[in-house]
UniProtKB/Swiss-Prot annotation:
Assigned protein family: Belongs to the class-II pyridoxal-phosphate-dependent aminotransferase family. Histidinol-phosphate aminotransferase subfamily.
Modified residue annotations for N6-(pyridoxal phosphate)lysine: 222
Cross-referenced NCBIfam families: hisC
Record protein name field: Histidinol-phosphate aminotransferase 2
Gene name linked to the record: hisC2
Reactions catalysed: L-histidinol phosphate + 2-oxoglutarate = 3-(imidazol-4-yl)-2-oxopropyl phosphate + L-glutamate
Pathway as given in its UniProt record: Amino-acid biosynthesis; L-histidine biosynthesis; L-histidine from 5-phospho-alpha-D-ribose 1-diphosphate: step 7/9
Biased composition (Polar residues): 1-11
PANTHER family: HISTIDINOL-PHOSPHATE AMINOTRANSFERASE, HISTIDINOL-PHOSPHATE AMINOTRANSFERASE 2
Cofactor(s) this protein cannot do without: pyridoxal 5'-phosphate
Record flagged with keyword Amino-acid biosynthesis: yes
Originating organism: Bacillus cereus (strain ATCC 10987 / NRS 248)
Keywords, ordered alphabetically: Amino-acid biosynthesis, Aminotransferase, Histidine biosynthesis, Pyridoxal phosphate, Transferase
Length: 366
């Protein structure tokens, strides 16, 4: 069978190893997964209560327009329901946008170290990918602006950024948007929006009234703790959302997922508590790093990134202690867990860096 030539340069997405897979390599630990930025506290108890009490006819297709969920999102965010598109996770939403907007000869512009699916889907559509290096872990919007040309169809901005956890502030983002042609779509991926505590983080939804070329993406997979249900959504001007709906598969969000997300979106107290505990967890890691002179990027998400050498060694040390983290070529990303889980990982990191210092001293004295 012949497939697109460009597929030969791509690999299927490789998620982090599951606890079951880890046991095959590292023994029968009670593994804690801190690699995929899931909510360690799960979802709102209201979701579990309501799903147990409710009855869904599993022989029927779901509401193809996710009407109740979209209306719930629209009411809370003060937009029109027609401005909301729901997908099976943000992965599908990104695919929908790419399929609708891109063709051979186009290009996208994004950061060099960011969510990989932007690049993945652009290549599938036969597009050039222009990747701009991060500046100290942050999107460099000046350089991204310089990289945009007449063939640029999409600029992807992950804010806060995955995997670094850093963010672009309101002033810089607004200035950037004003300098980009309305012929170029600006997609702002706010998957970690609920975790943000920075006062100067951009409020992007008001920008939609003025700019027809902006899409804002959010998800129920992170703070809302519904990763297994796969629900993400895009918000934009009605005309743009209508065009994207042409590409969206019918019945793409299951009835169960629609109901769970609708219930979860109404539990503000749960999200407030999750953000509070997550902020304390970030402070645990940041305090440890400062005390031990370990580099890190200040995070506005539910993970922290340490730009360190020997990421593989840190991954192995954590794995042998029963913790699954995510290694990268230039560091490690660790999901914030419960206080006890954070303490466990910090203990492993402490031992690793102490051993490293001891080894350096021994080599210097040899």
């Amino acid at each position: 069978m012949q497939v697109k030539d460009q597929l030969s340069s791509l690999q299927p997405y490789k998620p982090g190893k599951s606890p079951e897979q880890m046991k095959e390599v590292y023994g029968d630990h009670a593994f804690v997964k801190l690699a995929s930025n899931e909510n360690p506290f799960g979802c709102s108890p209201r979701v579990l209560d309501e799903l147990q009490k409710s009855w869904l006819d599993h022989a029927l297709y779901p509401d193809g327009g996710a009407t109740t969920l979209r209306q719930t999102i629209a009411n809370k965010l003060q937009v029109q329901m027609e401005q909301v598109l729901c997908g099976s996770g943000l992965d599908e939403v990104i695919q929908i946008i790419s399929r609708a907007a891109l063709k051979a000869g186009d290009n996208i512009v994004t950061a060099g170290a960011t969510f990989p699916q932007y690049r993945h889907h652009a290549i599938i559509e036969g597009c050039e990918v222009k990747e701009v290096p991060l500046n100290n872990g942050v999107y460099d919007l000046d350089e991204i602006s310089s990289a945009v040309n007449n063939n640029t169809k999409i600029v992807w901005i992950c804010n806060p950024n995955n995997p670094t956890g850093t963010y672009v502030n309101d002033r810089k983002l607004t200035q950037f948007i004003e300098g980009i042609s309305e012929n170029t779509l600006i997609v702002i991926d706010e998957a970690y929006y609920e975790y943000v505590t920075a006062k100067d983080f951009p409020e992007t939804l008001p920008l939609l009234e003025k700019h027809k070329n902006i899409l804002v993406l959010r998800t129920f997979s992170k703070a809302y703790g519904l990763a297994s249900f796969r629900v993400g959504y895009a918000i934009g001007q009605e005309e743009l959302i209508e065009k994207l709906n042409v590409v969206r598969l019918p019945f793409n969000v299951s009835s169960l997922a629609q109901k769970a997300a609708t219930i979860a979106f109404g539990d503000d107290e749960f999200i407030e508590e999750i953000v509070r505990v997550n902020t304390e967890g970030l402070q645990q890691y940041e305090s440890f790093c400062k005390e031990n002179d370990i580099p890190f990027y200040p995070s506005q998400t539910n993970f922290i990134f340490l730009p360190v050498e020997n990421a593989g060694e840190i991954y192995e040390a954590c794995a042998h202690a029963g913790f699954i983290i995510r290694p990268f070529p230039n560091g490690v990303r660790i999901t914030v867990g419960t206080r006890e889980q954070n303490e466990g990982v910090i203990s492993v990191l402490q031992q690793h860096f102490e051993n490293k210092k001891r080894k350096s001293r021994d080599e210097a004295n040899a």
